[in-house]
Amino acid sequence: TICDGETFNIQPTDNSPTEIVPVGTTYSWSAPVSNPAGAVTGGSEGASQASISQILANITDYPASLTYTVQSEYNGCKGEPFEVVITVNPTVGVDAIADQTLCNGDNTLAVNFSTTLSNNSNNVDEGEISYSWQNDNTDIGLAASGIGNIQSFTATNSTTGPITANITVTSVYTYNDVSCDGESATFSMTVNPSPLVEFSEDDQFITSGDTTVPVTLSSPTDGVTFTWTVAAEDGITGLTTTSGTDTIPAETLFNTTTEPLTVTYTAIATGDVGFDCEGLPTDYVVTVNPLAQVNPVNDQVVCNEENLLIEFTTNITGGTMTYTWT
């Protein structure tokens, strides 16, 4: 048994005393017979050859054979005709596979390989078809190679731009314990990044009544848009905008309590139409400290040269209070 397009070579050997093959024996044969008819090409008659050898092709989707009736000859003496049967496995392909475009963190669709064969109208024995594949970019989260179908996996992209893996699948046809590589098909998996959000300013700390610095949103990934929402702790007043896109505006904020409060802007970057992928929410925090306050200090009356201690206190919490006096 050989693969489609291969050369077979048979050189009868001496097995005395039952099978004697003198050195110099030649072989001749008439045109071989294909089964099924016309399934195997490349066979032709031969005369006075040192061995039986030809290149054969199987033009069907199933195993087919070619039968040679061979006549040996040595020094003008002819031996008994004998048959040589060569089975030729077919070359089969791989059905087209759809490309996939995904976002970082998505689960891929499982890829189940298949091969469409012509009708087995001659009811010949069929072999088994298996598949092997090669992946040229393991950064997407898929191994460099494998055998059989590709199960669903989590696609990854740790860069700021799209990455693509090209996966080449090859069919393998096995019959009579002979495995023959078939045709290949290639498909791609493109994994788009989760765009990051970057802020033009560090988190801000202000005092009640102060105005924040405007903040511009950006991303190392090209072609993204931004959305943000804001949440403030109870006791914050002065917010005029509750959502936006690429700029967090200046706000004059007030803290009506005695402890620091925060205003949290949560921003999300989304890829453009080419890859509609959302990044992870990213927070930008403004801390609004309360106005410093000193509790009233009682007047004191002391005697001459008596020690005097005046302690300052505050109801403000959440930080360190210092005092100056004149």
State what each model feature region is.
Residues 1-326:
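Extracellular low-complexity Ser/Thr/Asn/Gly-rich intrinsically disordered segments
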